[in-house]
UniProtKB/Swiss-Prot annotation:
Protein name per Swiss-Prot or TrEMBL: Dihydroorotase
GO CC terms: cytoplasm; cytosol
BP GO terms, sorted: 'de novo' pyrimidine nucleobase biosynthetic process; 'de novo' UMP biosynthetic process; pyrimidine nucleotide biosynthetic process
Primary role: Catalyzes the reversible cyclization of carbamoyl aspartate to dihydroorotate.
Names of the cofactor(s): Zn(2+)
Length: 342
């Protein structure tokens, strides 16, 4: 296949940052996607409907001239979130979900939940008004091996959560293991997003020729057997699995440092990366549903009507992109990629 035209996709897990960083990265997403679920982990985080409304206006103001893009907002769940805020979020129409970060799990997660059991009243309100919960599904116990933190989270927290709130719609975000795939398949009212890096790379990519900080993200890349399980899930045609890049921009000097930030930047070339992954298992015919149908169906939103086209036209990913401070290094910077969005 040399050409692929599909319904315009959406990104169901995206970091846009704020200020000058927002203005630097937003054009990449606007070019590829019609909508995106925007993560709330700013400094300070987006904790209220008022915060979300203000952030949404800043995003809309940064859309390039002629661009068509709808930011779908989220609230940052904390120990102090109250049920009244959930009711207001649902009524707002522009807040589409609430994000759970375990405190300290990833970038700007210091305000996260210290004990999910403290959130029972809020989760009950979310179940009642049908507002989805988005989970960064890792435990933060330093005694748990970093490669096992998703599996342990499912066993320790997610299984009891499903039993307590069976009608709550849940997205287990950026899944990385066969354990997560099997859990999502077995549970009702639960879906999962999958990133391009977790479809394309195993943990070997982190250490190819030395430490490779631009492949470091959380949850961390896993064994090859887990990558293959994710690839099978993404290309299976099961509507529980859909696109979420988790594209996370960090300045080069924040990645290439003694204690580098977690996150891969893929918004520039996300659809090309996904196309490469799907083509690797002869499943390009499954890409449209994964990228364009299953996400809006889960969120009970209309599917897009516009289209995009990808062509077999090899090109080289830039070594660096403009970004505040010290530039932004995209995933697989400097390498050739087969597909190109036209």
């Amino acid at each position: 296949m040399e050409k692929l035209t599909i319904t315009r996709p959406d990104d169901w897990h995206l970091h846009l940052r704020d200020g000058a960083a927002l203005k630097a990265v937003l054009p990449h997403t606007v070019r590829q996607f019609a909508r995106a679920i925007v993560m709330p982990n700013l400094k300070p985080p987006v904790r209220s409907v008022a915060d979300a409304a203000a952030y949404r206006e800043r995003i809309l103001a940064a859309i390039p001239a002629g661009g068509q893009f709808e930011p779908l907002m989220t609230l940052y769940l904390t120990d102090n979130t109250n049920p009244e805020e959930i009711i207001a979020a649902k009524a707002s129409q522009f807040v589409k979900a609430v994000k759970y970060y375990p405190a300290g799990a990833t970038t700007n997660s210091d305000f996260g939940v210290t004990d999910i059991h403290r959130c029972d009243a809020v989760l009950a309100a979310m179940e009642q008004v049908d507002l989805p919960l988005l989970l960064h599904g890792e435990v933060t116990d330093s005694n748990i091996d970093i490669f096992d933190r998703e599996k342990v989270f499912i066993e320790k927290y997610l299984i009891p959560l499903r039993e307590k709130f069976p009608r709550l719609r849940v997205v287990l975000e950026h899944i990385t293991t066969s354990d997560a795939v099997q859990f999502v398949l077995s549970a009702n009212n639960i879906a999962a997003t999958i990133t391009p890096q977790h479809l394309l790379f195993s943990r070997n990519a982190l250490f190819k020729g030395g430490i490779c900080p631009h492949f470091y993200c959380l949850p961390i890349l896993k064994r090859e057997e887990h990558r293959l399980s994710l690839l099978h899930a993404a290309t299976s045609g099961n509507p529980k699995f859909f696109l979420g890049t988790d594209s996370a921009p960090h300045a080069r000097n924040s990645k290439e440092s003694l204690c580098g930030c977690a996150g891969c930047y893929s918004a520039l070339h996300a659809m090309e990366l996904y196309a490469e992954a799907f083509e690797s298992v002869n499943s390009l015919d499954k890409l449209e549903a994964f990228a364009s149908f299953y996400g809006p169906d889960f969120y009970q939103l209309p599917r897009n009507t516009a289209q995009i086209t990808l062509m077999k036209n090899p090109w080289r990913i830039p070594a660096e992109l403009p970004f505040p401070e010290s530039g932004l290094v995209p995933l697989r910077a400097g390498e050739e990629i087969t597909w190109q969005m036209v």
